[in-house]
Regions:
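Active-site helix of classical SDR
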Residues: 120, 156, 164
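Short C-terminal tail/terminal secondary-structure segment
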Residues: 91-94, 145, 224, 235-248
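Conserved mid-core segment of classical short-chain dehydrogenase/reductases
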Residues: 68, 91-106, 125, 129, ...
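Conserved glycine-rich cofactor-binding loop
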Residues: 12-13, 36
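Short, flexible catalytic-loop segment of classical short-chain dehydrogenase/reductase
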Residues: 37, 161, 178, 182-193
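Catalytic Tyr-X3-Lys loop
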Residues: 98-117, 132, 136, 160
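Residue(s) in the substrate-gating loop at a strand-loop-helix junction
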Residues: 140
């Protein structure tokens, strides 16, 4: 990863933050993005402490102008874009389908699906100009499973996987690989909000064949691998990092 330029959306917490640290420790130049200036600048400073060149750029992936500026600033600062990790997401509304609204649907899909589409649009343009690149979209094991009372989130992650595989085929001969990483139950703030109680969280962990929740750093290892040259013959793939959850 040394000298490669990596852009990560939703980078300020959880899996995004762990991925930023993992890439920085491997010598990549890292641009982290999110919507909280203080946290973003602090993360960039932390990444620089590992010897990485790092920048924070505030952007809302739901807004195309923000995404365009994010990619343009990345290329202007570092000259290219080698790896894009589209991680920005929200857990959305949890509850029965009878309680969902147009607003709860839009709130989830605008970030989890539209945000990925807009990000890929501008990332691909930058990568096409240089003739190479890697895109890693962050899905979930719920991107190929069902989950009661999480229909909107599950639907959004199914969409991410379908978009990933379709764009991978679209770009297969262009030098750009497109893959997804699907975390299983991972100990993040989003999971804590999603499960609601410590008891629910423990029950979810008990369903994992390896007997525990994953750590963000373990998902980050999968992201770094799928973006690396070791995975050069892999495109259109969804890599489960889930402790065996999807095989259960």
């Amino acid at each position: 990863m040394n000298t490669q330029v990596v852009l990560i959306t939703g980078a300020l917490t959880g899996i995004g933050r762990a991925a930023a640290v993992a890439f920085a420790k491997k010598g990549a130049k890292v641009v982290v993005s999110g919507r909280r200036d203080e946290a973003g600048k602090a993360l960039a400073a932390e990444l620089r402490s590992f010897g990485s060149e790092a920048e924070f750029i505030n952007a809302d992936v739901r807004k195309e102008d923000d995404v365009r500026v994010l990619v343009d600033k990345t290329v202007a600062r570092f000259g290219r874009l080698d790896v894009a990790v589209n991680n920005a997401a929200t857990e959305g509304a949890v509850g029965p389908i009878t309680e969902q609204t147009a607003e709860s649907f839009a709130a989830t899909f605008d970030t989890n699906v539209l945000g990925v589409v807009l990000s890929m649009k501008h990332e691909v343009r930058a990568m096409q100009a240089q003739g190479s690149g890697n895109i890693v979209n962050i899905s979930s094991t719920y991107g190929h499973e069902g989950a009661a009372f999480a229909s909107i989130y599950v639907g959004a992650k199914h969409a991410v996987e379908g978009i990933t595989q379709s764009v991978a085929l679209e770009l297969a001969k262009s030098g750009i690989r497109v893959n997804a990483v699907a975390p299983g139950p991972t100990d993040t703030g989003m999971l804590t909000r999603f499960t609601g109680t410590a008891e629910n969280k423990a029950a979810l962990a008990a369903q994992v064949p390896l007997g525990r929740l994953g750590f963000p750093e373990e998902v980050a290892d999968g992201i770094v691998f799928i973006a690396s040259n070791e995975a050069r013959f892999i495109t259109g793939h969804v890599l489960n990092v889930d402790g065996g959850h999807s095989a259960n």
